[in-house]
């Protein structure tokens, strides 16, 4: 039985001979859906429209949006990450537009996570003005912060981090020359709490804490304890902690688990290594590499930094490996998965900002990057839309029936709720496989087996529960 027959008989199936796209079903349940879409550099109007058009109906749980605070001027993407005030007035939209976006997403059952900067302000030395006209210099933000609210004289030239394995430097020196806030200060903490609570008042459901590793975990906790919903299901926290899982690293990822989820960058590195050269059969025990517990892990095949650091699979990776990596990530039971939705030019030009100033629109099924004016629209790809429904359906079921007859061919089930096959080799794969699915579903025999043919560099995902 080939995959075309399978597709006609199940709720969701994915064929990935290339980056083929299908429109997702509009059905999803009231149970919280788990997948986060990082809408990188999309403006607020575009995200609100996309929540209505596709993100909500497709069953995504969250959108992660860029930092909404006023920042330094400029078109490059990284200007968003140099705040100059806590006015909701970034290049992606103003306060009214932000609130409109949140309301539109909420109306379709989608929660909103804001990328949030507690560690630092800008690196701009001389007098300047931000995106909303606020005057500032590197260590003076009138009405907000002054010189004594920052770390100084940390013991390195120019006060910049040199040794990224030294706890004191990591948490007291400047990251890339960015003015480093003294987050131990009661005054600084109060300003950060005001900002977080303002975002909450506008409907924000969670925060991605940028550069969390550069803030002592107890100081970050002191801030978050003053935010309504902290340590409840009403507020999702994920923290950017590079590394911290290997022997000898002074700042440990586990220090931050009490505050929320933690990024697992090692996960992305392992996915790339397996799909490019190491063999995907090695991924069976990906959840037991000594990183952090699945319940606290926020994982991704690539995020916006990974696109620019050459340590992750991207849309430019060869032989459909990026798409297949996404299929695996959404099928495998480790962590909460984030999926990047970005733009094509940023993969090669690491500074360039978004097309059309962030005004994004995915045409039809999102397949044609040219028609989308340079936006990749990954959240509309079959691998993401179809496998998001798969993940929503299988939820907490266990990985079972792992089969890997060759290093680049794997199949496994998620309990009796879902089954996935990935062929990362160039040649077709004809096999009789154990599905774990109930007999009589998708032509599964009485022994629970199914015979399939799957093209090279392709995958199939099946679930038997409506979402």
Locate predicted features:
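Classical eukaryotic N-terminal signal peptides for Sec-dependent ER targeting/secretion
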Residues: 1-9
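Active-site-proximal helices and loops of the catalytic beta/alpha 8
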Residues: 9-16, 21-36, 40, 49-56, ...
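Alpha-helix-centered segments that form part of catalytic cores
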Residues: 15, 164-186, 388-397
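Active-site mouth loops of central-metabolism enzymes
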Residues: 35-46, 178-190
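Glycine-rich FAD cofactor-binding loop and adjacent beta-loop-alpha segment at the N-terminus
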Residues: 83-89
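Solvent-exposed, flexible loop/coil residues
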Residues: 90, 185, 441
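Core domains of carbohydrate- and sulfate-ester-processing enzymes
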Residues: 129-176
């Amino acid at each position: 039985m080939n995959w075309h027959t399978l597709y006609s008989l199940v709720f969701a199936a994915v064929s990935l001979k290339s980056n083929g796209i299908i429109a997702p079903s509009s059905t999803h349940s009231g149970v919280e859906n788990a997948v986060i879409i990082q809408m990188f550099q999309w403006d607020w109007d575009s995200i609100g429209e996309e929540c209505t058009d596709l993100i909500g109906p497709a069953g995504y749980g969250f959108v992660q949006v860029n930092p909404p605070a006023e920042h330094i001027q400029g078109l490059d993407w990284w200007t968003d990450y140099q705040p100059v005030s806590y006015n909701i007035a970034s290049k992606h939209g103003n306060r009214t537009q932000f609130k409109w976006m949140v309301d539109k997403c909420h109306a379709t059952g989608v929660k909103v996570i804001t990328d949030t900067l507690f560690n630092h302000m800008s690196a701009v030395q001389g007098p300047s003005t931000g995106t909303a006209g606020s005057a500032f210099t590197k260590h003076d933000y009138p009405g907000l912060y002054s010189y004594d609210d920052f770390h100084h004289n940390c013991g390195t030239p120019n006060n910049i981090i040199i040794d990224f394995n030294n706890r004191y430097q990591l948490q007291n020196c400047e990251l890339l020359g960015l003015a480093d806030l003294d987050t131990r200060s009661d005054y600084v903490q109060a300003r950060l709490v005001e900002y977080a609570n303002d975002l909450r008042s506008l409907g924000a459901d969670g925060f991605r804490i940028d550069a969390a590793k550069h803030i002592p975990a107890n100081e970050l906790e002191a801030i978050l304890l003053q935010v309504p919903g902290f340590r409840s299901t009403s507020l999702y926290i994920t923290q950017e902690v590079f590394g911290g899982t290997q022997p000898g690293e002074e700042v440990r990822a586990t220090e931050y688990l009490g505050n929320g989820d933690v990024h697992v960058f090692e996960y992305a590195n392992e996915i790339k290594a397996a799909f490019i050269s190491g063999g995907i059969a090695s991924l069976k025990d990906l959840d037991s590499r000594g990183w952090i517990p699945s319940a606290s892990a926020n994982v991704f095949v690539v995020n916006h930094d990974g696109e620019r650091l050459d340590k992750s699979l991207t849309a430019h990776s060869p032989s459909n490996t990026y798409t297949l990596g996404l299929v695996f990530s959404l099928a495998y039971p480790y962590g909460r998965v984030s999926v990047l939705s970005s733009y094509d030019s940023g993969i090669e030009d690491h500074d360039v900002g978004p097309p059309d100033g962030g005004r994004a629109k995915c045409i039809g099924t999102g397949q044609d990057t040219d028609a989308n004016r340079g936006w990749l629209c990954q959240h509309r790809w079959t691998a993401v839309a179809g496998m998001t429904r798969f993940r929503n359906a299988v939820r907490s079921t266990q990985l079972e029936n792992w089969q890997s007859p060759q290093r680049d061919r794997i199949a496994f089930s998620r309990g009796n709720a879902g089954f996935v096959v990935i062929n990362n080799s160039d040649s077709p794969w004809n096999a009789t496989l154990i599905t774990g699915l109930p007999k009589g579903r998708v032509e599964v025999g009485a022994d629970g087996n199914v015979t399939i043919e799957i093209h090279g560099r392709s995958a199939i995902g099946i679930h038997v529960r409506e979402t």
